[in-house]
Amino acid sequence: GFRMDVIDMIAKEPRAKILVNGPHLHEYLHEMNRQTWRNRDFLTVGEAWSASPEDARQYSDEQREELSMVFQFGHLWADRQVGGEKWEQRPLDVAQLKQALYACQTTMATHGWNSLFWSNHDLPRAVSRFGATGQYRELSAKMLAIALHGLKGTPFVYQGEEIGMTDCPVATIDQVNDVEARTIYRQLRAQGDDAGTAMQKINIFNRDNARTPMQWTAKQHAGFTTGKPWLAI
């Protein structure tokens, strides 16, 4: 298959201040479909942060000949502050999460197709975000897997999710590789946060959480390498 990054931005018109869902977006995708993957047996999935369930149905309706499906992220706002920054977390609103998942299932019940996911290379680990990392880590991982695989759509299992890998909090900014997190840290310090408070916020949505080496064994460096890994485990 073929994943398309931020596909909802390919028709942006900056002068008109249109950055997503530009007027020619679906026209471009239809042309791309006809000229490249049409009549070929592979999957196409587009990343579309701006997509509503209705938008996702347009992208993935077979009759429109655009994409197989898109990643749309409505369910991942259930623990975020509306209009806030990405590190401004709030307690998980389970009702909102259920409503978002239900909307996707019903909107694409007959036309279009769902992608199913909890996490990716830019998001925190699902168990740390939606479950528990201590005594109930294994049960949390199983619960999230059952919830995901019980829905209609194509499931995407991010590496490490199948064994319940968790976030890897760090103590200082020197331990962070994620360039976005380092930039946000400087901004938080400039706004008056002390180092400890800034790191608490960074650890919530630091993209390094999803980019630590895959854990294969209980040996040093989780059996991933005999050398020095790029991130701590």
Map each language-model feature to its residues.
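Active-site and adjacent substrate-binding regions of carbohydrate-active enzymes
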Residues: 1-233
